[in-house]
Amino acid sequence: MAAKQVLFADDARVRIVRGVNVLANAVKTTLGPKGRNVVLERSFGAPTVTKDGVSVAKEIELKDKFENIGAQLVKDVASKTSDNAGDGTTTATVLAQAIVQEGLKYVAAGFNPIDLKRGIDKAVAAAVVELKKASKPVTTSKEIAQVGSISANSDSSIGQIIADAMDKVGKEGVITVEDGKSLENELDVVEGMQFDRGYLSPYFINNPEKQVAALDDPFVLIYDKKISNIRDLLPVLEQVAKSSRPLLIIAEDVEGEALATLVVNNIRGILKTTAVKAPGFGDRRKAMLEDIAILTGGTVISEETGMSLEKATLQELGQAKRIEVAKENTTIIDGAGDGKSIEARVKQIRAQIEEATSDYDREKLQERVAKLAGGVAVIRVGAATEVEMKEKKARVEDALHATRAAVEEGVVAGGGVALLRAKQAIAGLQGDTPDQNAGIKLILRAVEEPLRTIVTNAGEEASVVVNNVLNGKGNYGYNAATGEYTDLVEQGVLDPTKVTRTALQNAASVASLLLTAEAAVVELAEDKPAAPAMPGGMGGMGGMDF
């Protein structure tokens, strides 16, 4: 086991705080509409230029191991805030630095760190209550666009495209961000339910121009096993043929004789059919087949429930207004399912989302909700170069997370004003001991820091602006983009309540843990012996020119 180095009390804290400051100072230059970019070196390819706090934080690794502890703790604040709220990483970093710096002064003056932490927790709880009181719900498309614009570093085109996407697929809909092919941002909307399985044979195509099999007013047969024997399918095919309507077959697989017969009937025009594989795998496949059945008003024909394919009737088949089957995906538009059943299914999946522990499961469940609820929007980000594309894509993703957070918990005045107004609630608090009062006082100073940083980045005098804003009321604040004092909500300078709340809670949590640390242990670097010198070259090779 490698030897360790241990530092205690102030020796440990001073070194750790140095690391906190290095990371926080790099991250906080990006805060606000006039924040600067940070250039990140890459081992391969072009460097990345970003104004995203968490991207900067993730790149920082310090040589001094004690300093690195501080940097990693603040990095954790940024990552947690990004995971929970999707934005607010820079604000969280700025708050964490302020709490640590103020807290250390008190610890050095002999205050009890545990009581300081209790005071900090009391003050943060009061600030959160105040933020929730000040929060107002986001209802209009204009407000969504404003939130998106602020999060995308005051880029109104990004805010607008996100608002348009939410208009089209609803606030619960899935919105994905992809690389575009042009210089402009574009929005594509897939209405209805789409899953990533295409036709099993190109002979099913009936629209050569689009290379799709388009079925109007079709029946949908959903089966959870393989179909290889045409005899199992014949009874249901005969019933469908009598109705003169097309048929989509969704099964684990359709192969051999069954597939050949379907293709021949399709080419001859006897029965218009298309077959696709069921989406997903294992339990997820079962759940998705059930979703399709509910959406189309059909039933999953499964031997597990005592049903068999040869006994299937038209009553068990789903229906839709239109289905398009391409090479790699199938889109079901306007399924004939009962609205109440779909709603109940969505409710059931939402309950599963609440209980999901992994991000992957949560994402897949969210996708299922969106497909049942009405569609998927794809924002294609346009840019001139790959470096710009990466930077812009990160901003669009940030803005998307921020707007979702705003829809979830509402918005408060941006520009650091909401935290500043929470000072009134904190100032009225009384701790059980003088040390707890010091913790409360510490947060009173720390909540000013986001506004101070925004103003400093805009090239103005922070103390003057903070005093002016404190003398105002409600949403009155400083708009760093225009350099004016105004009603920030009217100007569209908004922050999602969830983002501001999460930033404060995470910053206080990690910073107060750091203040209560009394020792730090790191591994000592091993002194490795130098590698032996390379042997000399072969004799008699002189005079050769290399």
Swiss-Prot record:
Its EC number is 5.6.1.7. GO terms for biological process: protein refolding. It is an enzyme of class 5 (isomerase). It catalyses: ATP + H2O + a folded polypeptide = ADP + phosphate + an unfolded polypeptide. It comes from the Bacteria. InterPro entries: Chaperonin_Cpn60_CS, Cpn60/GroEL, Cpn60/GroEL/TCP-1, GroEL-like_apical_dom_sf, GROEL-like_equatorial_sf, TCP-1-like_intermed_sf. It holds the Pfam family Cpn60_TCP1. One of its GO terms (cellular component) is cytoplasm. Its main location: cytoplasm. The keyword Cell cycle does not apply. Forms a cylinder of 14 subunits composed of two heptameric rings stacked back-to-back. Interacts with the co-chaperonin GroES. This is Chaperonin GroEL. It comes from Bordetella avium (strain 197N). The lineage of its organism: Bacteria, Pseudomonadati, Pseudomonadota, Betaproteobacteria, Burkholderiales.
